[in-house]
Amino acid sequence: VLFPLPWQNEKHPTDPRGRTNGEVMREILLWRSKFVLPPTTLGPLLQMSACLTHHVSSKDLKRINDLVPKIAIITGDWDQIVNPSHSKHMHKMMPDALYEVWKDAGHAIHIQFPFTFNKFLRQWIGLPPVHD
């Protein structure tokens, strides 16, 4: 759900064992799960409810556009969590925001393309690039 299947099947660029992106991501997510408390019964239900009922009106989006000095709306063209058309609508209501659609990207752009995302973010907030 978070990552496009073709990307999951590609060889991970830095994995010394030559595994795919999907294999590396599964290992990372399993490792991270060891450090979080198991959810309560109510937790996942409330999260689903929040996702299903969350709404920000066009009026509120315009107000955010007017009050927040710097906004970036970044979406993947393959986002299965937030339909890219919703991000496009957000930009329509917040025309001062930077708007980018990343090709072949899912919902977790910062995980799928960490180096590209960090480079973008550093440039966008005015920090110098990090040299390898």
Which role fits each region the language model picked out?
Residues 63-68, 93-94:
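Short, conserved loop/helix-junction motifs that constitute active-site signature segments
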Residues 60-63, 86-89:
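A short acidic, amphipathic alpha-helical/loop segment
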Residues 1-33, 46-49:
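Helix-rich cap/lid subdomain of alpha/beta-hydrolase
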Residues 67, 73-75, 79:
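Short beta-strand/loop motif that positions the catalytic acidic residue
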Residues 88, 92-132:
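Catalytic active-site module of serine/aspartate enzymes centered on a nucleophile-bearing elbow/loop
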Residues 33-60:
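Hydrophobic, aromatic-rich cap/lid helix
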Residues 80-86:
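Conserved alpha/beta-hydrolase "acid-adjacent" motif
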Residues 49, 72, 98-100:
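Structural signal for short hydrophobic segments within the conserved structured cores
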